[in-house]
A protein has these predicted regions:
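Transmembrane signal-anchor helices characteristic of membrane glycosylation enzymes that use polyprenol
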Residues: 11-49, 233-247, 377-380, 456-462, ...
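Extracytoplasmic/lumenal acceptor-recognition loop(s) of multi-pass membrane glycoenzymes
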Residues: 59-81, 299, 304, 309, ...
Length: 874
């Protein structure tokens, strides 16, 4: 390696080290092993318990099913781990230098965007600047703080994926294929399909521009080669993730993101042909005026945290209102979203450079229009219900768009395109400094850009309420409905004044940053003018370093509002959840084998996973729960819970059975006089043996002795025609004695059965996450219903012979059992997993072959070059 090449390599190593240092400094607690305490982070802890226990007992194998939340569900979107991914996981660890969690997410984001800009032939310092402003966009830190780590990881790999595509466009087909395939594989492996899907917008527009460019220049051969390389890379990436993608796709059909089989009257206009309801898709829609947060972070108050926590706002607080505690009850955010963890802010100086790019980049440059159109589409779609006609068009006509909720998150595309176009504009500005004719034009365009961006900031700084009071319509309506007009007006006026102060402060802040950035560019201009277009390396480097420092300082300080050291805790503090006296009592009474379920009403039952630390829960939290189970929750479970609590009336207390656990006394009840089939039949068929009543201060365990158990024989079969009838029938018949069967499963268990004998039984004898064994005894044979959730892939055998599994009672499993004593085994080991794994291994081999071939061709090229130089010298 010659000195020039060695120097270049060392510079790249220095850049990588710089990125690592920046990420490490920001996440100092992570270097000590501390973990975030974000809501979704904590929610995942309960999920991991059963999965980790299974892995410990099965040589690290990941279960494809868990029983601990929502009465049981697949793990395709909880722990999407497959053996074929191990090689790429090892590659990923090398790529992020083995840095700790959180640290490497930001490091990988910076490195990925740096690779992209280098593929575009940007100077090193500009590539560093672009990498920092992309990675430090506020949204990325907000999602890390919230525990949306898959999203952060996926986003980190999108820029280098596009870098590979750019390399193909530039004729480096083999390396372009390798880079695209490698990072597309890692991107998809990040397991946030929504982010990958959204970025198809700029990617398809880029490819379209490339096609047009090739056709105009009559470079058809180049177009074909590049297209083949990109397509091959896409096939390899998809194939390597075949197991995850296939099962995610199939699973989505059965989740809340799939189309419901229920026909809901009166909601036709809210339905989509497939996917979520329109109101659910657009529940989190970015406000139109809220879009100014790209330039001014507190345009709508920032995050939904108490107003009392903002020092700037409290300077304008009313002492009388403050003493009443209202400022602790109202949030800083006043936008139209239900709530938010923070704004989408891309940086004030970045916005200046973006506007500058609109003027300095020639209109004939296709990249300019690709990035502008992508930015506009991103913003319009993020508005969601605030621009419903446009959103409806995408929901109705764009494939798969209706599968994703929280449309505001599509702003990540703008967070990508704005910095990229800004860097292109900055590059053009510096390049044109050497041209005496273009130089004055650059100055004029810089001044115009400064006036536009700075003027917007100045407008909001001096007139923060010009576009209305700083109070949301929902907030105003709520307060006016609870207070008399005078009190409501006083409160709303105070809130508006305090929030206006926050907006004013941030508007001035953005203006100052814009003026500093503009001053640096002016200085570069005057240096070039006074030196006939030439600027020394030292001056250029100094200005570049100052621009980097301004951008990093700006975005660092904003991100610290939403992601800071106080949000970390030592692992022992965060994850080591100790058993409560209630937990001890339940385990003492019913054991810890997880062969029963618990309804925990002392927490937000269907938004909390803490119950799953020690028990199989009726509730839980996961954004992609099974759709039928969600419909059962809405139609039956929520309705039955209050009735179930009423069973434990004081007159049924069994004082002789009161027991103690953990130093506390807990009541017991005699439910022999209660008809469980009419009070809470659905909860009973789910084997809900325990209810926990109370709140976070005091919990009371209530034993439900009426639960049906793990399985039972029924007396009758009720065949229905559709999902509506199936769900409604549970209001009319007792699941203890009847199996409600959709007609599509009638051939599996028949349309009638022999009534169960009093001596018939089905007993659970062994169970793991993915298997269950039963002893079934019946005099005449019959239909057995199991208190386990039905899902395609569950297979059953009777004495080793396979039998079909039917769906009963809307969500449960049922099989037909012959007379006599039999061993029933249920197993969840979907054959599709093994088939897709074979596809993944083939694609892995092809990728490794491509890497080896690219390395060989690069070695051959350099070797031939050296031979040529030696020959020329001779």
């Amino acid at each position: 390696m010659n000195k020039k090449a060695l120097k270049a390599l060392l510079m790249e190593v220095a850049v990588v080290a710089c990125f690592a240092a920046i990420a490490c400094v920001y996440f100092t607690p992570a270097l000590k092993g501390w973990r975030l305490t974000g809501e979704d982070n904590s929610a995942n802890d309960g999920l991991r318990v059963e999965i980790n226990e299974y892995r410990e007992k099965n040589g690290g194998e990941t279960p494809r099913w868990i029983n601990s939340i929502f009465s049981g569900m697949p793990t395709y979107q909880i722990a999407p781990s497959y053996d074929s991914q191990k090689t790429m996981t090892a590659v990923e660890k090398v790529y992020h230098l083995g840095l700790p969690d959180y640290v490497w997410y930001v490091f990988a984001s910076m490195l990925g965007f740096y690779i992209l800009l280098r593929a575009f032939d940007f100077r090193r310092w500009m590539s560093v600047l672009g990498a920092i402003v992309w990675a430090f966009s506020s949204y990325f830190f907000i999602i890390i703080a919230a525990g949306h780590l898959w999203k952060a990881i996926t986003l980190a790999y999108i820029p280098p994926t596009i870098a590979g595509v750019v390399m193909c466009f530039k004729g480096r087909y083999l390396w372009g294929f390798v880079v695209t395939a490698l990072f597309a594989t890692l991107q998809i492996n990040g397991n946030h399909v929504q982010m990958t899907y959204y970025f198809l917008i700029p990617e398809l527009l880029m490819f379209g521009a490339f096609v047009i460019q090739c056709i105009r220049k009559k470079k058809v051969a180049h177009l074909v080669k590049a297209t083949v390389a990109i397509a091959a890379a896409a096939v390899i990436a998809v194939g390597l993730n075949a197991s995850n993608l296939y099962h995610t796709y199939k699973y989505a059909e059965d989740t809340m993101r799939g189309k419901s089989e229920l026909v809901k009257e009166g909601k036709q206009e809210d339905q989509t042909d497939s996917g979520l309801e329109r109101s659910y898709i657009t529940q989190w829609s970015y406000g139109i005026s809220e879009t100014w947060s790209l330039l001014i972070p507190n345009i709508k108050g920032g995050a939904s945290v108490p107003l009392a926590l903002n020092a700037t706002a409290m300077k304008h607080a009313d002492p009388q209102i403050n003493s009443a505690g209202y400022y602790n009850m109202v949030g800083q955010y006043w936008g139209e979203q239900p709530g938010t963890s923070g704004p989408v802010y891309v940086g004030a100086l970045v916005c200046l450079l973006f506007v500058l790019a609109l003027f300095v980049i020639p209109n004939r440059n296709p990249w300019k229009w690709v990035l502008i159109v992508s930015t506009i589409l991103s913003i319009l779609l993020a508005w969601g219900k605030n621009f419903m006609g446009f959103t409806d068009f995408f929901i109705d006509h764009v494939p798969l768009y209706s599968k994703f909720r929280t449309v505001s998150s599509i702003l990540v595309v703008a967070e990508f395109t704005i910095p990229l176009l800004a860097m292109m504009g900055l590059k053009r500005f510096f390049e044109n400094m050497g041209d005496a004719q273009l130089r004055p034009q650059m100055l004029q365009k810089l001044m115009l850009s400064t006036v536009i961006t700075g003027g917007i900031c100045l407008f909001f700084a001096v007139a923060p309420t010009a576009m209305g009071d700083c109070v949301s319509s929902m907030e105003a309506q709520s307060i006016r409905s609870q207070l008399d007009p005078q009190s409501a007006n006083m409160l709303l006026s105070s809130f508006s004044e305090m929030r206006a102060a926050m907006l004013t402060s941030d508007a001035w802040r953005s203006l100052v940053i814009i003026l500093i950035g503009a001053a640096l560019l002016y200085f570069y201009y005057f240096t070039a003018k006074n030196n006939k277009g030439k600027v020394s390396w030292k001056t250029s480097s100094a200005i570049g370093a100052l621009i980097i420092m301004v951008c990093l300082g700006d975005m660092w300080s904003i991100n610290k509002r939403y992601m800071n050291d106080s949000m970390f805790k030592m692992p022992a503090e965060q994850t080591a959840r100790q058993k409560t006296p209630v937990d001890d009592y339940i385990i003492q009474k019913s054991g810890d084998k997880r062969d029963y379920r618990v309804f925990n009403g002392a927490v937000s039952t269907f938004n909390d996973n803490t119950t799953s630390f020690f028990f199989n829960s009726i509730g839980g939290y996961h954004p992609a729960k099974l759709r039928r189970y969600q419909e059962l929750i809405e139609t039956h479970i929520v309705e039955e819970y209050p009735k179930a609590l009423a069973m434990f009336a004081p007159e049924r207390a069994d004082t002789a059975a009161i027991q103690q656990a953990g130093g506390q006394m807990f009541p017991a009840y005699d439910l022999s006089s209660v008809d469980g089939d009419t009070v809470c039949p659905v909860l009973n068929m789910l084997n809900t043996r325990w209810f926990i009543y109370g709140d976070d201060q005091r919990q009371i365990p209530l034993e439900n002795t009426l639960a049906y158990g793990n399985a039972w024989f029924v007396d009758n079969i009720k065949v229905v025609d559709n999902a509506n009838q199936e769900l409604d029938a549970l209001h009319q018949v007792s699941p203890r004695h009847n199996a409600v069967i959709d007609k599509q499963f009638a051939q599996v268990v028949g349309d009638k059965c022999e009534p169960a004998d009093s001596a018939d039984y089905v007993k659970l004898t062994a169970q793991t996450s993915t298997t269950a064994e039963y002893e079934a005894v019946s005099k005449k044979g019959g239909v057995a219903v199991f208190s386990e959730i039905y899902y395609p892939g569950w297979e059953a055998t009777i004495d080793g012979q396979p039998v079909e599994v039917a769906r009963a009672n809307y969500v449960l499993r049922a099989i037909k059992v012959p007379a006599g004593k039999h061993k029933v085994t249920m197993t969840f080991d979907p054959p599709t997993v093994h088939k897709t794994e074979k596809v993944a291994y083939v694609c892995l081999a092809l990728l490794l072959l491509g890497v080896a071939l690219a390395a060989f061709m690069e070695w051959k090229r350099k070797n031939n070059k050296e031979k040529t130089l030696v020959a020329d010298a001779a």
